[in-house]
A protein has these predicted regions:
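Alpha-helical transmembrane segments and membrane-interface helix-loop junctions
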Residues: 1-198
Length: 198
């Protein structure tokens, strides 16, 4: 169990730091997204002429918000779950079931990692240029010049998958430690501000 705890502590600290930064960026992305959508509604219905880039900008914010918040929700148990069977099982059975589901999730995440990189970020679409989003002040960056490269949007999926893999490995280690009787040595991951469906 000492080896597992030695693996868990650095990973837990890394996830704490990375997910805290991701949360701040995700909240900023949400604020930008809301402002862009409200601005688009205002310009469309009041001035009868909405800028064409606001929709794509809002989508950009939504993708990054989702990619950065999904790992935090996964870690804190914030996803919707049907846990009747888990609650009906004894503690060891519930932990084994949770461990099996986390291993299946890990396998799915590894497949998604490949798809996120090869089918989105490093694909023909990902290498393309945005139709309407441009860098401010006419700045030219890379092969797309003043337009955003699509990779900046599609990278949200791949970054989110990487963070989900880190969280999944941490949760697997925590379940293994629980099976070995070390549950009392684990810190509680549920945030105080995390809403639940209980």
């Amino acid at each position: 169990m000492a080896v597992l705890m030695g693996l868990l502590w650095p990973l837990e600290r890394l996830n704490n730091a990375v997910l805290a930064v991701g949360r701040v960026i995700a909240v900023a992305a949400l604020a930008v997204m809301v402002c862009l959508i409200l601005g688009q509604v205002f310009f469309r219905y009041v001035l009868n002429d909405a800028p064409n880039w606001t929709e794509e900008g809002a989508r950009f914010g939504m993708l990054w918000m989702t990619g950065l918040m999904a790992p935090l929700a996964f870690r804190q148990g914030g996803f919707v779950a049907i846990d009747m069977l888990e609650r009906a099982l004894p503690k060891i059975g519930a932990t084994l079931l949770s461990l099996a589901l986390l291993c299946i999730s890990f396998w799915v995440l590894i497949i998604a990692w490949d798809k996120g990189l090869n089918n989105h970020v490093d694909s023909l679409t990902g290498r393309g240029c945005s139709s309407s989003l441009r860098w401010p002040f006419g700045i030219e960056v890379g092969k797309c010049g003043p337009k955003f490269a699509n990779q900046y949007q599609y990278a949200a999926l791949w970054v989110g998958i990487n963070l989900l893999i880190l969280v999944n490995v941490e949760l697997i280690l925590r379940n293994l430690i629980t099976l070995m009787g070390g549950a009392d040595r684990l810190t509680d991951l549920r945030g105080e501000d995390m809403a639940g469906a209980d």
